[in-house]
Curated annotation (Swiss-Prot):
GO terms for biological process: cell adhesion; embryonic cleavage; negative regulation of amyloid precursor protein biosynthetic process; negative regulation of apoptotic signaling pathway; regulation of mitotic cell cycle; ribosomal small subunit biogenesis. This is Protein AATF. Its main location: nucleus. Residues 273-315 are annotated as: POLR2J binding. Hyperphosphorylated during the G1/S phase transition. The lineage of its organism: Eukaryota, Metazoa, Chordata, Craniata, Vertebrata. InterPro entries: AATF, AATF/Bfr2, AATF_C. Ubiquitously expressed. Expressed at high levels in brain, heart, kidney, placenta and thymus. The modification N-acetylalanine is found at residue 2.
């Protein structure tokens, strides 16, 4: 069912003598009829932002014509209508449409003979219209001056129409209504502003969360890169240590002080020149290592005092990034590196001892700091591990107390090599075993390798093998267990390491008491294996003859 009809159309239908035709498809029930309600727009287009009108208020605005008499049409004259039209004309306003409808209604009423009113009635109507027009202008000016209030913001029409059923309402009621409208508008604007603030807070919280997460991710990535670089640096140092192991074994074989003059006398000038060149090379290497140590100590702020001679700052254990940048800038401006001293060979022991004593302060502080961090991360250990509850520095001091035992471990000969100028140890004779009697083997003394001490050597094979074992375990721990090739390589590396540590010596294979044989490899692409054995054809023939009791060739037997 359509909405309320304008006044002109109602008058036209009343004056039309023809009967109206009923639409059979029209819905007689008003409650179930479909309604199309236009947007209620009473203000000018140039004013503030529009407010969203809810469905309940739209229904309330549609029924205003039925409940309030002010929204119904009223009689007026053409002169008054023209004055009102020209004074209130604004582009795009809804008043033009209303005035056009009223004008069309007046023209229709004039054409239908509605000029039967008396002049007195028309004058009274004109005066009343002029008074209403002045009041409307005053109300518009008041609404324009009042900040934060506009006609378009009026949305609560039920409160606006309370107590206004009569046309002759007083100004006090109008003031109260305007106050109620302003209060409603303030509540609506306050509610919207709170929603906007909540949205802004949510957006700010999201921004903070995103920023925090990005910062956290970047920090974790930076830590991962630092750990990766540390592992790569440790691998390079370990590789250098592995290469130095061969040089260490060769150094242990050099002539010792008691026989060195004899080698020097018998070596002649060639031996003396080689000795002089090696002495210069070792001196240059020692200076390079000391220079590298000074460079590394100077680059790190916590160890710079060891090089430039300043006092250590024990309070500052960690330096922030900003302080580190300032230190780098100052270092670029002026780098105070101590003058390099050319030390003699006899000065290096005292210099290195003093450097180590100064470095001990920083070493102990760093060890204690990281020990505390790992202890907090791993939690408190059980009562059974009381030794680990002590400080890391206490444990180190306890181990270093027995220096003689530690020195004996470095002076113990663990590898098989011969020191030049020393006689070879006499081999113990192996007693022959008579037939029918059990074989007698020489009894080796218990822990014989620990009794082979030499004060002129330095042997740390136990520590070296421990480093190799840890390296192999770390390299192979990240392998896929399903990768058979990688597992095979790991097994070969472990077996090679074990063969270096413990050599398998078969004592029963001496003096020809055990047959030695070589297993030939399988055929590959119909190619016979290459014979790497040292036996010639005559030895093989003699071997096969001895197996079957034929010690002499067959032709010799027939000749006899």
């Amino acid at each position: 069912m359509a909405g309320p009809q304008p006044l002109a159309l109602q008058l036209e239908q009343l004056l039309n003598p023809r009967p109206s035709e009923a639409d059979p498809e029209a819905d007689p029930e008003e409650a179930t009829a479909a309604r199309v309600i236009d947007r209620f727009d009473e203000g000018e287009d140039g004013e503030g932002d529009f407010l969203v009108v809810g469905s309940i208020r739209k229904l309330a605005s549609a029924s205003l014509l039925d409940t309030d008499k002010r929204y119904c049409g009223k009689t007026t004259s053409r002169k008054a209508w023209n004055e009102d039209h020209w004074e209130q004309t604004l582009p795009g306003s809804s008043d033009e449409e209303i005035s056009d409808e009223e004008g069309s209604g007046d023209e229709d009423s004039e054409g239908l003979g509605l000029e039967e009113y008396d002049e007195d009635d028309l004058g009274a109507a004109e005066e009343q219209e002029c008074g209403d027009h002045r009041e409307s202008k005053k109300s518009r000016s008041h609404s324009a001056k009042t900040p934060g209030f506009s006609v378009q913001s009026i949305s609560d029409f039920e409160k606006f129409t309370k107590g206004m059923d009569d046309l002759g309402s007083s100004e006090e009621e109008e003031d109260e209504e305007s106050g109620m409208e302003e209060g409603d508008d303030a509540e609506d604007s306050q509610g919207e502003s709170e929603e906007d603030r909540a949205g802004d807070r949510n957006s700010e919280d999201d921004g903070v969360v995103m920023t925090f997460s990005s910062v956290k991710v970047s920090e974790e990535v930076e830590k991962g890169r630092a750990v990766k670089n540390q592992i790569a640096l440790w691998d390079q140092l370990l590789e250098g240590r592995i290469k130095l192991q061969k040089a260490l074994l060769t150094t242990n074989q050099l002539p010792q002080p008691d026989v060195f003059p004899l080698f020097k006398d018998k070596g002649g000038p060639e031996f003396s020149s080689a000795l002089k060149n090696s002495h210069k090379a070792l001196k240059a290497l020692l200076r390079s290592l000391v220079g590298l140590q000074e460079e590394l100590l100077f680059q790190y702020p916590d160890t710079r005092y060891l090089v430039d001679g300043t006092k250590p700052n024990a309070g500052s254990e960690e330096i922030s990034s900003e302080d580190d940048e300032l230190v780098e800038e100052k270092k670029q401006q002026r780098r105070r590196v101590p003058a390099k001293r050319k030390l003699e060979m006899e000065d290096y022991p005292s210099f290195m001892a003093k450097r180590f004593a100064d470095f001990t302060v920083y070493r102990n502080r760093t060890l204690q700091k990281w020990h505390d961090k790992t202890k907090l991360a791993s939690g408190k250990l059980g009562k059974g591990f009381g030794a680990f509850e002590r400080s890391i520095l206490t444990q180190i001091d306890h181990i270093l107390m027995d220096k003689e035992r530690l020195l004996r471990r470095t002076q113990t000969k663990r590898s098989v090599y011969r020191v030049l100028g020393k006689p070879e140890p006499a081999a113990q004779p192996v007693p022959e075993s008579l037939p029918g009697e059990p074989e007698i083997l020489p009894q080796a003394p218990a822990n014989a390798h620990l009794k082979d001490l030499d004060e002129e050597i330095f042997d740390d094979d136990d520590f070296y093998h421990q480093l190799l074992r840890e390296l192999i375990e770390r390299k192979t721990s990240s392998l896929d267990p399903n990768d058979q090739v990688a597992m095979g390589r790991q097994w070969l590396a472990i077996q090679k390491l074990r063969s270096k540590i413990h050599k398998k010596v078969d004592r029963k294979a001496s003096k020809g008491r055990k047959l030695r044989f070589h297993v030939l490899s399988k055929l590959l692409s119909f190619m016979a294996p290459i014979d790497h054995t040292t036996m010639n054809d005559d030895a093989r023939t003699e071997l096969y003859r001895s197996l079957f009791g034929q010690l002499h060739p067959p032709d010799e037997g027939h000749g006899d």
